[in-house]
Amino acid sequence: MKLPPKITRLPIVWELRKLTLYKLSVIKTVFKYKRFSIIRDSFVYFPIWWKLQQRKNEPLKNDRPWITFSAEEFLRKILRKDMVVFEYGAGSSTLYFSRRVAQVFSIEHDKKWFDHLQHEFAKQQITNVVCRLIEPEAIDENSENNYSSDSPSYKHKTFESYVKSIDAFPDKYFDVVVVDGRARASCITHAKSKVKPNGYLMIDNADRKSYFKGNDFLFDETEWRVFDFVGAVPYQFDFAQTSFYCYTPNR
C-alpha cells in the first residue's frame, strides 16, 4: 500500500527509510564483494554516516571528503604537511587537503560549482589552493574523442584540455593525485607518471570498471601496491569503493 504524501514526509518515516536503505546497501555490497568485513565496518561507520545524512548538513562545512569512510581514515594517516596534491574534481576534498598539506592544485569543469568554491576559499581564508576552471569543449559528433565523459550531459564534448592540465608538471612531482572528476580513464593515463615514489594515485568510485578501460596494463604489480576500501560514503545511500595505488618502484 502506498502511503499518503503527508505520511511519507513525517520525520520518523524518513528516518526509517534511511535505515532500511543503509541495510540494503550493506547486504548488496557483501554479496558483490564477498567480504564480511563490510558488515563490521557498516556498524563502525554507521553513527557518523547517520549524522551526515541530516538534511541541514552542508558537505563543504564538514571537513570530510566524499569518499568511503575507511578510505578517509587511511588518507588521514598518510597525509603530511609537506605534501603537494593534485585533484581532478574540486570540492569538499579540496578543503580537506588544504588543512593537511602544503599545496593543492585542483581542476574543475563546472563553472557554477567553481564560482561557489572560490567564494568558499575566500570565506575560509584558504591560500594554499590553486583551483583552475577548465570547461569541456564542443567537438564534431563524428570526431574521435579519447577524452569523453560517460555522462550524457557531455555528449559531443571533449575534456582533453582538462585531462592534459597535469602534463604541465614534471614527472614524479605529486605526493597524491586524486582522480574524482570527468573522463577518469584518460585522467588515470595522464596522472600515473606524475606520482612520486611512495606517493599515491587515489581513484574514487574505483568499482566502476569503465574508469579502468585501457588502463589495466598500466599498473605493474611489481611497482604499484593497491589498497581498496569498500563501504559507506558520506551523504549517500549506495556503498562504493575508493582505491589507492601506491607507487613503489624499488620494493
What residue spans do the PLM features occupy?
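P-loop/Walker A phosphate-binding loop and immediately adjacent motor/lid segment at beta-alpha junctions
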Residues: 38-45, 50-52, 100-103, 120-133, ...
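Short, basic, glycine/proline-bearing loop/turn elements
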Residues: 56-61, 78-79, 173-177
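S-adenosyl-L-methionine
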Residues: 118-171
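Short, flexible loop segments at the rims of nucleotide/cofactor-binding pockets, characterized by
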Residues: 61-66, 82-85, 152-157, 177-180
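C-terminal substrate-binding/active-site "lid" region of AdoMet-derived donor-dependent transferases
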Residues: 166-171, 176, 181-251
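SAM cofactor-binding core of SAM-dependent methyltransferases
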Residues: 69-141
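Membrane-proximal basic amphipathic "stem/tether" segments
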Residues: 1-66
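Short, contiguous clusters of charged residues that form electrostatic/catalytic patches at enzyme active sites
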Residues: 69-73, 95, 160-164, 172, ...
